[in-house]
Structures are given as structure tokens and as C-alpha cells.
């Protein structure tokens, strides 16, 4: 399951579909999270704000690690939340833990 803040939708995800999403020429912020994770719950409104601010300049999505174990393994997600920015299929930035909206906006803008 993937939650897309820009499209305001939830859809099933697999490795092929994920690779299509991150191949975008616009930056894609990916939040690897878990439903049982307190800090992940704190990030949800932050990500909503970031998605509104960046608009269609970037995409903000969430990936549930418990429902997408293959993606979690491939991208070596060891703690949640783990946030990554991809552009043209390449990992451009990565961090773990609660991250302020200003930091996420700044990192996304580097890749517009």
C-alpha cells in the first residue's frame, strides 16, 4: 500500500510500480513508516504540510514497511520513519527519525 499526498490516494505497490514512481524527473519524497510507530504518526501532518507547500514540484508518498517487506529490504530500512528523496531513479538524500518540515522542503527544493 502506498499513500500519495499529491493525488490524495492509496494504492497497492510493488517493486516495479515503486521503480516507476521514483524514476520521475521530479523529486519523490518517500516515507517508510509503520502503523505501530509513534514517531511515524508524528510525521504524518508534517508530510501533509510539505506536500501542500511543494505542490506539483515534487511528490510525497508513504510506504508501510510491514506491507512492503521487499522494498524495506532492498532499501535497507532499519528504523522508522526513514525518509528518502529520489529523482530519476537515483537516491539523492536519506535520513531516519522525525524530521522538521523545513528540512524536508529544503532538501526537496535542491532537486527541483
Residue ranges and their predicted role:
Residues 1-29, 34-59, 67-74, 78-82, ...:
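Proteins that catalyze or organize thiol-disulfide redox chemistry
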Residues 62:
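Conserved residues in the N-terminal Rossmann fold of short-chain dehydrogenase/reductase
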Amino acid at each position: 500500500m502506498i499513500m500519495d499526498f499529491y493525488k490524495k490516494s492509496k494504492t497497492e505497490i510493488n517493486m516495479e510500480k515503486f521503480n516507476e514512481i521514483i524514476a520521475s524527473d521530479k523529486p519523490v519524497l518517500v516515507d517508510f513508516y509503520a502503523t505501530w510507530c509513534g514517531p511515524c504518526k508524528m510525521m504524518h501532518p508534517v508530510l501533509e504540510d510539505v506536500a501542500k507547500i511543494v505542490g506539483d514540484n515534487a511528490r510525497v508518498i508513504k510506504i508501510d514497511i510491514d506491507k512492503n517487506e521487499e522494498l524495506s529490504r532492498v532499501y535497507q530500512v532499519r528504523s522508522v520513519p526513514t525518509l528518502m528523496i529520489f529523482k530519476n531513479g537515483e537516491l539523492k538524500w536519506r535520513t531516519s527519525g522525525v524530521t522538521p518540515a523545513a528540512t524536508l522542503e529544503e532538501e526537496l527544493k535542491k532537486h527541483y
